[in-house]
Every structure is written in C-alpha cells, then in structure tokens.
Amino acid sequence: MMKRRRIFMYYCFCFLLKYVAFSNVTNPNTTLGHFEICKINIYSGDAEECVLENEFGKMFLFICDIDYNEMSKNIVLPSECAKKTYIDHVNPNGTSPEVNTYDIFPDLIGANESKFRDKFYFYGTPYSSKDIDFICLCFSEVKPDIKHIIKMSFKKMTKKIKGCDFGDNVPTKKDLTNGKALYENSSCHIYAYPGDVIGINCYKKDINNIYNNNLELSPNNCFHNVYYENDILLSSKNLIPNSRVIPDPSNDVKLSKMHSYMSYIILPDEINENVKISCSCKRNEYVGTMFLYVNTSKNILTYTGNNVEETAHLNDHYISIGDMWDMGLYENPEQIQSIISNHANKKYYEHMKIYKGNKMDPSDEDESNENAHNGNRANKDANYSEKMVDNRRQKNNSLNHTNYHGNYNENDNEINISTHDKYYEDHHLGSNRPLRKKRTFWQNLFGTSSSYYEVFNYFSIAFILIIHMLLW
C-alpha cells in the first residue's frame, strides 16, 4: 500500500514540475490614456508573456526591454513582426511556420519602426471575422533558449461596422456594412448616432491587385478632416467635439499603403448638433462619395435596416431622407410625417421638389388641392401608385441586397479567391494539410494566454492534496 502511494506521489510531483516550473510568466498590462502597455524583460531567467486582448480605440504597445549598457542584441521572430507572425500557437519557437499577417487579417494595423527593434505598436480593430491569436517572439542573444512571447488576441464578432467599403472586397475581407465598387460613380449614405463607430475604406484588400492603382482618399486624412456641405474642408474635432479618429494623426505607427486608405471615427456619447459631412474615394475617373448624417439622437429618421439610403414613398416617386435633410426638415419630424401621409398626392411631391430647388410656385399648391379632391381619379391613381410602390420596394430591396454583398457575382467570387480564404480552406476538413490548431478546453476555460497552466496548477495541487489526505 505504501509503495503505491509513493509511486502515485512521484508521478504527481513530476506532473507539477512540468507545468509549474516550466510554464510562462504572464506579465501585467498597464493602461495609460488610450495606450495598453505590456513590457518584457528579455534578461529574465523565466519565459515571460504579454497578452493583449483586442479592444477598438486602444493602441497596444509591446516593449522588449533592453539594457543598452549590456551592448547585447535582442532577436525578434519572425524578423518582420508585425507584418509576419505566428498564429494560434501555444508555445511557438523559431521553427514554427510564419504567416503574412495582413493576408490573414487585413484590418490589423501594426508596425515595428523602432531602430533597436524593441517596440511593437498595434491598433485594436473594430471587427474580427474569427477567433485568432497573432504571436511574435523576442529574446536576448545571450539567452537564446528563453523565448518571450508577445500576443495579440482577437475574438470573433458578428456585427459589422457602419460604413462604406469602396474596395470591391469579398465578404470575408469586408468589415463595413455597405459595399460599393469603383467601376462607376456611386454614393453611400450612412446615418449615425451618439456612440456609433463609422468607417470608410477605398482599398481592395488583395496585395498587388491592379484595382488599387491610382487610388485617392479625399480628404487624404479623412476623418480627421471632412467636407462640410459637400465642399467646405473642416476639422472633425471642431464639427463633432470629443470625437476620435483611428488611426491617430501621429508617427507612432507608420501606416502601410493598405491602411492609408481606411479610416474610422468614434462618435461621442453626446452630440449637440445635427451635421452632414462627407469623404470620398477616387479610382481613375470614378468617384464614390460617402455621406454621413450625424444626428443628436434617434427620431423619425432612425434607420433599423441595412444602412442604405432610406426613402419615404410618395405615390410612384421616392424622396430620400438625404433630400429631406437638404430641405432642412431633419429638425421637423411632424412635417416629414405629413409628407409621408400625403404619399398618394403626386402633385404634393412635385411641390416638394420645387421647394427643394427654391422655386416655389403658389399655383402648384392650388393644383395639388384641386387634384386631391378629384374623387374617382384620385382613388384610381392611388391604387395604381400603391402597385408601383410595391414594385419599387421589391426592386430597391433587390438592389440593396446586391450592394450589401459587395457588387460581385458568382464568377467573380470563383476567380477572386483571397489568400485568407485559401489559408482557411487549407487548414480545414477536405485538405491534405494538417488542421490548424484550435483553442483548447483550457484556453477557453482560463483565457488565451500560453500560461493557462497557471490556474490549472492550482486545481492540480488542490486535487493532489485531497487524494493524499484520503489515501493517508
């Protein structure tokens, strides 16, 4: 009996030695303004690990702390971190396969522009299509066996960001709600409210794609500067106080070409004035314009669908809420409702068109009143108009559905298979390559850190003590 107890205790000791003595030490994070900072001491005798969870609006700073008096070098793997990284590894090493970060996850904005290669900057992203971890290693040349881990962890999101993507991107590479392609002039209308995040993108997220030749974002630092009333260039800080734009206007992160054509604005929780602003994407002779209607609160203009331009049906015609905004009616919901309730009166709509063009004619009002009381004809026209409205609605819904899916057809989808899609398919069932490593039970239970054994160790020790007391 005693011999079995000793054998049991020996195996328990070896088990604990493996997972306690050799697990990584997770370093704490420090918050400073919009920065989330984690520092690693590469001269430490224990393998250290920094894990930062994605949070949009944050800038993540990893520091591989170097004692410059030692005159020793630090080594970073992959050597082009953050352009290349390891993904979804528990404990990667120098022989682990590298991936091109932006092929797999094009919305990640990160760089290492430090002369001594000891600082790494990343922006938190507003959208992630999957659960994924990006990892780099840093260590001292005098202690090459102790490799420290820096990790960015992303959780899958189901809700995309309000905004306009003019990059003709497939759904897997599109994080904005509205998709347009710059093969013709187009416009995109977004209605925003306090606390919303809004985005614009001009870039087709495929490396070296000819679509990206001769691209221009106007203004080139949208949303830092925006067009007010279509042609007046103003600072968003003055138009929408307390708003914040990502990427920030600083030299902290040197943007790649791809990330120079995308921008996000975070609206404050309180907005005092309704404002209409715009930015545009240009490709050769084609222009795609994004109109952003920022409201102080949700009212009759509130949109509950898929962020394409709302319309109120007037007989067999349509009047857009963008037009209502231009008329100055956004502050008068009663007048808007009056317009909608009179939709069977075609002359009333024509009257509003004249009003919009500042060409008011009193005779139009008299004609509209006369026709509105013309019984049988009005009823016949109303019935006919209802049919036209239904047909127009079906047509618009079909167009909206097409726009939402990025204006690409089945053949285009077969041809433009993205690097991300190839990677995703190659690591799943039906491929001869090994499956990509998934999150383990312990990672889901205790977090994404490679040191998830740390909590498991406590349970193990408690379990062994209980067994020991029972057997003793």
From Swiss-Prot:
Residues 359-385 are annotated as: Disordered. InterPro entries: 6_CYS_dom, 6_CYS_dom_sf, Parasite_Repro/Invasion_Surf. SMART domains: s48_45. Keywords: Cell membrane, Disulfide bond, Glycoprotein, GPI-anchor, Lipoprotein, Malaria, Membrane, Repeat, Signal. Disruption phenotype: Attenuated parasites that cannot commit to infection, even when they encounter with hepatocytes, resulting in continuous traversal of hepatocytes. Cells lacking both PBS36 and P52/PBS36P are severely affected in their capability to develop into liver stage parasites and abort development soon after invasion; possibly due to the absence of a parasitophorous vacuole membrane (PVM). It is found in: Cell surface; Cell membrane. Glycans are attached at residues 24, 29, 93, 112, 185, 295, 306, 383, 396, 400, 416. The keyword Magnesium does not apply. Residues 24-157, 160-299 form the 6-Cys domain. A lipid is attached at residue 449 (GPI-anchor amidated serine). Involved in sporozoite infection of hepatocytes and replication therein. This is Sporozoite surface protein P36p. It comes from Plasmodium berghei (strain Anka). The gene is P52.
